[in-house]
Amino acid sequence: MEFNISQLKWTRKPQSYDIKEDKIEMITKPYTDLWQRTYYHFRNDNAPVLQMKTKEKYFSFVVKTEFESHQRFDQCGIVMYLDSENWLKASIEYENEAFQRLGSVVTNNGYSDWATTSIPASIKSMWYRLSRREDDFCIECSNDGQVFQ
């Protein structure tokens, strides 16, 4: 599967963006998120999503994110999005000056499940590798783009 910016489509556009062959930059509007029915009893499906469709059943892609978080719940990550009720994301969510949460959210049939681990708030970039093997998906992360866990 080749990356081709002409195949990218917005589900929802951010406040501003710049797309190049080797880099995508975006600034989101405040209070945007992807989240569905869970313990917190609220639903959000208003975050910007830039997608590329594929019929491939076996693929992996790697993305490096760089971000500046300032307020609690600021997030930066990647998403595989089918519709508002079925998607998965990997992201870092800022909590405070001491720590933030590296996590994944899997949403299936409208219900989100969030798994996290705390990491230092000083981390301002993260590599993600998402892989699909038919109906199975794997999310991995890396600090250096070489060693993924």
Predicted feature residues:
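Extracellular glycan-recognition regions
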Residues: M1-Q149
